[in-house]
């Protein structure tokens, strides 16, 4: 097997519990985004656009939908013979193996896969962020700095910094301190969960971490702080582009709404850094004679007979006559019957809302989760149902 300079390991096994009923049946990287994509499309497309042709996808939580979607990787041009895409679930071997105990342990359990390609560098990715990035430029920076580890970093608002791993650097970009989700952050320079390691350094760090009974086997909590304590050369690579962590209902909703901005739509379809997907091939949209569309994305295979405003409509969705959809996200193959009012709602895949329903109705006081209503996948909402804003519907209401 030809030695690879760099291979990617994509962590895609997370449940995404903060997304509630959206991840009841699928892992977070498989959740639909922007009407056309799955969240994992962004990391896979970045690999393809960066000429990284060997990707291990580490799955765990309810992996069937994600495995089926990725298939052989051809949608991202990652189906090459010498490399390509590989699904890497947890396994039990003769002397080791179990469920992945953390991000670092997930890589540790797949060291045989990495050794097979014997790369000089390892790119560690998360499968649950929305961004477009040239990893080759980051690798060039890593080499230029003679770094042993490079973390991609982005400046976030100070009030949000405690949600992330944050780093303090010197004038040359070398990381002096790193802390995962600190209550009082020293910096607003946040880790994006994108790391480049020299493979020999990572291998040694993983073996050491695995022997520590006190470790959570997590890169941010354990591996990176230990490497800093050892005096290793860790550098930050400052990213100036668009990046969103969509790990909560609020952040997922807001990121979808941002896609409706004209400059963001153009960016997704830019040929130089195009985002690829394995979306099902469907017929074009059908807009009825009374349909009204304002500032919305409408996926292929949709039938729109009502009115849609400031919304993201994924593929295969049906909206009946007299219905009004406002500031909402309709996930694939969901159905809205006649005379429905849907406001600031995320409607799960294959969910059905019968006629005359009112979903996202105003309530007194401050509603939870910024007033975003969420209807889970495959749920049936009976005729005439009224659901207040900010509610999470996890099971059929009748």
UniProtKB/Swiss-Prot annotation:
CDD domains: ADP_Glucose_PP, LbH_G1P_AT_C. Pfam families: Hexapep_GlmU, NTP_transferase. InterPro entries: ADP-Glc_PPase, ADP_Glu_pyroP_CS, GlgC_bac, GlmU/GlgC-like_hexapep, NTP_transferase_dom, Nucleotide-diphossugar_trans, Trimer_LpxA-like_sf. One of its GO terms (molecular function) is ATP binding. Pathway: Glycan biosynthesis; glycogen biosynthesis. The keyword Nucleotide-binding applies. Its EC number is 2.7.7.27. Homotetramer. Belongs to the bacterial/plant glucose-1-phosphate adenylyltransferase family. Involved in the biosynthesis of ADP-glucose, a building block required for the elongation reactions to produce glycogen. Catalyzes the reaction between ATP and alpha-D-glucose 1-phosphate (G1P) to produce pyrophosphate and ADP-Glc. This is Glucose-1-phosphate adenylyltransferase. The gene is glgC.
């Amino acid at each position: 097997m030809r030695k690879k300079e760099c291979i990617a390991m994509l962590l895609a096994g997370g449940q995404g519990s903060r997304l509630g009923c959206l991840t009841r049946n699928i892992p977070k990287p498989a959740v639909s985004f922007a009407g056309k994509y799955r969240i994992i499309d962004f990391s896979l497309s970045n690999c393809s656009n960066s000429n990284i042709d060997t990707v291990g996808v580490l799955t765990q939580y309810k992996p069937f939908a994600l495995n089926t979607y990725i298939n052989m990787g051809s949608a991202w041009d990652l189906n090459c013979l010498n490399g390509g895409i590989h699904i890497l679930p947890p396994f039990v071997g003769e002397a080791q193996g179990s469920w992945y105990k953390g991000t670092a342990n997930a890589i540790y359990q797949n060291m045989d896969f990495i050794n097979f390609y014997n790369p000089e560098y390892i790119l560690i990715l998360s499968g649950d962020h929305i961004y477009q990035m040239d990893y080759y430029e980051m690798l060039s920076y890593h080499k230029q700095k003679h770094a042993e580890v490079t973390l991609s970093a982005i400046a976030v608002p100070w009030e949000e910094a405690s949600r992330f791993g944050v780093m303090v650097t010197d004038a040359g970009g070398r990381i002096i301190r790193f802390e995962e989700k600190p209550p009082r952050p020293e910096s607003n320079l946040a880790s994006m969960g994108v790391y480049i390691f020299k493979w020999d350094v990572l291998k040694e760090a993983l073996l050491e971490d695995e022997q520590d009974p006190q470790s959570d086997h997590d890169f941010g909590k354990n591996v990176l702080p230990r490497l800093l304590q050892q005096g290793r050369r860790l550098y930050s690579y400052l990213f100036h582009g668009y990046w969103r962590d969509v790990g909560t209902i609020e952040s997922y909703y807001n990121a979808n709404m941002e896609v409706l901005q004209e400059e963001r739509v153009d960016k997704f379809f830019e040929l130089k850094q195009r985002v690829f997907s394995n979306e099902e091939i469907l017929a074009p949209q059908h807009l009825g004679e009374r349909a009204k569309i304002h500032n919305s994305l409408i996926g292929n295979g949709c039938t729109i007979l009502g009115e849609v405003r400031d919304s993201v409509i994924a593929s295969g969705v049906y909206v009946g006559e007299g219905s009004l959809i406002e500031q909402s996200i309709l996930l694939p193959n969901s159905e809205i019957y006649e005379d429905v009012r849907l406001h600031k709602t995320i409607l799960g895949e294959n969910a059905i809302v019968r006629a005359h329903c009112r979903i996202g109705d105003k309530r007194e006081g401050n509603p939870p989760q910024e007033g975003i209503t969420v209807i889970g996948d495959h749920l049936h909402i009976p005729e005439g149902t009224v659901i207040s804003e900010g509610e999470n519907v996890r099971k059929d209401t009748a």
